[in-house]
A protein has these predicted regions:
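Bacterial N-terminal signal peptides that target proteins for export
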Residues: 1-8
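Boundary at the C-terminal end of the N-terminal hydrophobic targeting segment
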Residues: 19-23
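Alpha-helical protein-protein interaction modules
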Residues: 43, 185, 197-207, 212, ...
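Short, charge-rich amphipathic alpha-helical segments embedded
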Residues: 57-72, 79, 108-110
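Short coil turns that delineate tetratricopeptide repeat
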Residues: 60, 105-107, 152-154, 197, ...
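TPR alpha-solenoid repeat register
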Residues: 65, 111, 156-159, 202, ...
């Protein structure tokens, strides 16, 4: 009887802990969803994303905890009013976490994507030639390719958009960087646009690719449609950036 009571107590404790963790995850996701609730001078107020980060850190379930932190670090660094040094710290925290957790969850497309996205954001803060010489651009390319292989549709074709944008915008640097290709940009960005035409960045990059590859009539048509759209509430800042 005593053994049964102890077992029952342990079971109740285990269930309670799981319910608490699940509750924290749901709260964290809600705060993340509301990350654009207050916009000030073109940036999101950090209150909701700070709460999201705090709550994601309390979650036990994986890989949800890691994915939540990675996307929250990226949002806070990219879309709230923080210094460049704080941006670099947030991106670096995400890169380190993703590198660690990608070994634990090697087949998780979301972790692979946020690893590439945070690394790309960090690289935007340093000189492109320096990033290329140090192999950073090649590493980001490899991470994006891995994310595409695992889940090309994740985050509205996020990895396709990222890698396609790199092929389109990263310059060829003699003896250092020779792989950027308009042909690859065309292939990747067309696919991203087809998968998620509602994402303003997909539309913008697709139209830009059309312009660069001399399909100006089609490019103009896509651009004209884009600027008539309204930013989506949950993606307000990124949509606004490309719609304007």
């Amino acid at each position: 009887m005593r053994f049964t009571k102890i077992t029952f107590f342990i079971l109740i404790l285990f269930v309670s802990i799981n319910l608490f963790s699940q509750s924290q995850l749901e709260k964290a996701e809600q705060y993340f969803k509301n990350r654009h609730e207050i916009i000030e001078n073109g940036k999101a107020n950090s209150k909701n994303i700070d709460y999201a980060i705090k709550l994601f850190k309390q979650v036990d379930s994986e890989p949800e905890k890691t994915i939540g932190l990675l996307k929250s670090f990226e949002f806070k660094a990219s879309w709230t009013d923080v210094s460049e040094n704080e941006q670099k710290t947030l991106y670096k925290n995400a890169i380190d976490l993703a590198e660690k957790k990608s070994k634990e969850f090697p087949e998780n497309g979301a972790i692979a994507y946020w690893h590439a996205a945070n690394y790309a954001r960090w690289a935007d803060l340093i000189d492109i030639t320096e990033a290329a010489q140090e192999g950073v651009i090649d590493e980001i390319k490899a991470l994006a390719e891995k994310a595409i292989e695992l889940d090309e549709k994740y985050n509205q074709a996020g990895a396709l958009r990222l890698l396609g944008g790199m092929h389109l915008e990263v310059p060829n640097i003699p003896l250092i960087l020779s792989w950027p290709s308009n042909a690859q940009a065309k292939k990747l960005l067309r696919k991203a646009y087809k998968i998620a035409p509602q994402h303003a960045a997909n539309v913008f990059l697709y139209a830009k690719m059309l312009h660069i590859t001399d399909r100006n009539k089609k490019s103009k048509k896509v651009f004209e449609k884009l600027i008539t759209e309204n930013p989506r509430e949950e993606y307000f800042l990124v949509d606004q950036k490309y719609i304007q």
